[in-house]
Structures are given as structure tokens and as C-alpha cells.
Amino acid sequence: MFVGSRKWVVLVATIWIQAFTGTNFDFSSYSSELKSVLQITQLQLNYLSVASDMGKVFGWCCGVSLLYFPLWVVLFMATFLGLLGYGFQCLLIKQLISLPYFLVFLLCLVAGCSICWFNTICYVLCIKHFPSNRSLALSLSISFNGVSAALYTLIANAITSSDDTLYLLLNAIVPLLISAVVLVPILQQPQPQPNSADMIRRDSLVFLCLNILALVTGLYLLFLYSLSSNTTIARVILVGAGFLLVLLLFLPVIVNSREWSCLTSPACYPLLNSRFNLINLDGGGGDDDDYDDDLHKELIENEDNYSRNRSSVIVREKCCFDTVLLKDQLKVLGEEHSTKMLMHRWDFWIYYMAYLCGGTMGLVYSNNLGQISQSLGHNSQTKTLVTLYSTCSFFGRLLAAAPDFLNRKIHFARTGWFAAAVVPMTIAFILLAITGSIEALRMSTALIGLSSGFVFAAAVSITSELFGPNSVAVNHNILITNIPIGSCLYGLLAALVYDSNADGASRDTMWLREMTMCMGRKCYLETFLWWCCISIVGLVSSFVLYYRTRHAYYDNFGRNTN
């Protein structure tokens, strides 16, 4: 086995964790049953989806826990939270126990917290073991979170295709089994080692092959999912998906074997000479202390160069608009930000708004997808739509690696890619407002999945680049506190519009206490228009963030080129 192979085992372990712990994607698959068992309104159901997202508010606790406990202990803490949250919900929906609404709300909160903890563990592992290619490792690992709904649907159909409540049982048990499987590589993590230029090129080839295999996996699930309604066929497709996931473990060994050694030559693959990492990829084989000293010197020198290079630009940007717009902008990438520094950064709050009105909107849409399809008369298509969203989210997350593969030929800031990714979401909401056909619903779901998936994956790398890689476990969890806020506000808006248009709904407060059913385009038409306007705010915020950070990225491109 080649040198450094153990780090690839750790990466594949994070991929498996992500693939089987994205349990928030299948909420729409059992939300109607949960609503029926609890006899609650759409507004109250929305609060339960918000509770799941509110778990992300406590994601920073995982980052703090990692400072005091071994990683494997934190992993099983996350597993226990999921087992507790989803396990009791499963018993409730099976009507084996009876719980008040408030306790169900707390269970959803605990279950959502487990998802965020799993994600944080994967972020830390990727950044620790791939300092030179952290963006590629993060995007690849995070992308597989998008196939969770498809995998859970296959597992459920392989057992029985008629019981939607099975999803809750799987949500509780499967992450526990996966955590047990990946325990060994996590316990035997290799010590991070400085990377030579040759090793970086070799790693780049492995990442390229892993991304190709990931693309094949996504296409496999997307095109064969429609055949999985039959239990026997679902089992065959599930075995094929399992084979592709296991193949990820052996692919790095195959690529780096002697028979394939010629492929690591720069003459064969010029792309392998690309500097995939935006932060100090040229740091070579010195000690960690030397690396930190070099990075510190580069940051200081780059800031001086920035001041000189910007002098001519400032002359042309004397107008009041630019003076306000560029106030306190970031001057260099990779600088570590404490929580206090983060709170005083304009760039962080612009970034926060861009995420709140961009990626979070896609998550709220997925939470409401079950009710949306039901109201439009496509209730039988709910599972297909959930899987379509999940799979397209996977492709979107996978596309987040494109800037790293293209940055040798296309020097474009990652925040610019982030802004461009929000555009399809706005188009999708316009399309939903125009027509309620199943074709439009599918196309819009795919666009929103692609858009939100890219945002989710790119955001981790952007947080690392703008506010420091060593602080990402805490800083990114602070960023995603926008998710429960957006989920509450946008979901509340959708629920109020839904219940107010329900058949037989009265104008008094009775509609808040009784289960309602709304059918027709009127149920979500106004909501789609509001969501479209909000996504435009996210788009504008994203372009403002790009405008403020583009010089820091371009200066960094120039430094890496030299």
C-alpha cells in the first residue's frame, strides 16, 4: 500500500458518514404521516421542521467538544443524539407511544443537532488530513450528504415499499451502524505529514478519479431510482450502490499503484500541476513550525503588496458608493479569526445574509416539498421529488470542486462562484410561480437542489479561506445559525399562506388548532413569489461579498502563480 494511503481511508470514512447521515433530506417522506398522527396544522408541522434545523444552533458545541474529547467519543455522542431523536419519533408515528407536541419538538431539535455534529466531525477530519487540498476533500465529502435521501429510499424500498414510517427507524439505526464501521480508521488516524510537490500532484489525480466515481454514483442513483419501487429491483440497485461506495476505498490504491505510476507524470496530465488549494499550496516539506512562520510572513508581505497594488485602484474608486461598499474589506485570505473578530467583520455579515437568503431557502423548500407536491395533486410523486432534490443537491455539491480543478486556467474568486450558484434558485421560484405542472415542479426541484447543494459545499471552503482553516469548526457553525432562523421565517410564511388558503379555513384562530388541508396552486403561489424575492436579496448579497473579496482572491492567485 502506497505512502499516505491511510489518509484516504479517513477521507472515505467521512464520505460514508456523510452519505448515511443526511437524514434531514427525507423529512418530506414522512411529514404527512407525522402531521396526521399528531393531528396538527401545517403551521405546527413547519415548527417541527424548524426544530430540526434549530439543531444547527448548537453545532458549535461539537467544535468545543472536540477540544476536550477524542473524536471517536464525539462521533458516538452524535450517534446517540440521532438515535434518541429519531427513535422516539418512530415509536410515536407507529402509535406505540403517545407524546405531547412539545416533546416531539424537542426530539426534532435533538435529531437535527446530531446531523450538524456529524458534519463538523467530517470537516475537521478533511481539513486535518488534507491541508494542501482541503477544498477538494471538503467538497467531495460534503457532496455525498446529498445522496442520503436516495440511499434511504432504496433501503426502505428494499425492505418494503409501502411503509413511509420506516424512514424514521432507518434514520435512528443506520448512522449508528456506519459509525461502528468507520470507528477503526478514525481510531488509527495517521499523523498529518508535509506534502511534497510530487505528492500534491499524485493526490490531485486521486481526487480527480474520486470525483469521476462520485459522478458515476450520482448518475447511477438518479437514473435507476425510478425502477426501485419493486422490492427485488430495489435490492439489486442497493447492492450496486453499495459496491460503488466500497470502490471508493480501493480507488486511491489502484490509482497510485506502480502500474498506474505513469499517470502521475506532469507530461501525461498537465492538470495535475494545478495548484488546487487557494491557501499556501506551495508550502512544501518543512516542519509545521516552519510552515506557520512562512504563512505568517506571506500574510504580512501579501498585505503590504495589497496596499501598494490597490493604490492605483483606489484612485479610480473615490466615489461614495465604493467607499461604503469596500469598508473594512478583507485584505488577505487565510487569516485566523476568533469569534470576537468574526462578529466585527462586515464580510461575515454579508456572507451570513447571502447564505440566509440563498442556501437556506433551498433547505426550506425541501422541508416543504411533501406538502407542495400534495397540494399540486402530485402526492404519488413525493418520493421521486425528494430523491430528485437530494441527488441534484449531490451534483451541486460535487460541482463545488470545479473552481479547484479550473483555477489554473480560470482565476475566479470562489465567492463569485457562490454568487453564480444562487441564480438557478431564483429562476426556479419564478418557474414555480408561473405554472404548477409536474414538469415544472421537477425542473424547479432539480435547479434548487443544484443551487443549494453548491452553496452548502462551497460555504465550508469559503469560511476556511476568509476566516482561517483552524477556526472553521466553530466559525462555520456560527455561520449556519442562519439556517434555523431562515427555516422559521420562510417556513412560517409558507405555513400561514397554506393554512389561510385551506378549504373551509375560517378567519378566526380556529385554523391554528385544527388540521387543515389545502389543494391547488393557491396554496403556495404567494409563497413562491415571496421566496423568489428573498432569493434575489441573497443573490445581491452574494455579489456584494464577491465584490469585496475579489482582490484578496486575485492577489492570492498571483502569489501562488509566482
Task: Please give the residue ranges for each predicted region.
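Extracytoplasmic gate region of multi-pass secondary transporters
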Residues: 24-34, 220-233, 332-334, 338-395, ...
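Intracellular juxtamembrane helix-capping segments at the cytosolic ends
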Residues: 27-30, 34, 115-142, 152-153, ...
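Interfacial helix-cap and linker-helix signal at transmembrane-aqueous boundaries
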Residues: 34-35, 65-67, 155-161, 224-227, ...
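Central cavity-lining transmembrane alpha-helices of secondary-active solute carriers
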Residues: 47-67, 84-85, 91, 150, ...
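Glycine-rich segments within core transmembrane alpha-helices of 12-TM secondary carriers
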Residues: 55-56, 130-184, 198-224, 392-395, ...
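Structural signature of the two symmetry-related core transmembrane helices
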Residues: 73-88, 414-430
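Hydrophobic core of transmembrane alpha-helices in multi-pass small-molecule transporters
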Residues: 85, 98-117, 440-454
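Long, low-complexity inter-transmembrane loops of multi-pass membrane transporters
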Residues: 186-344, 350, 552-562
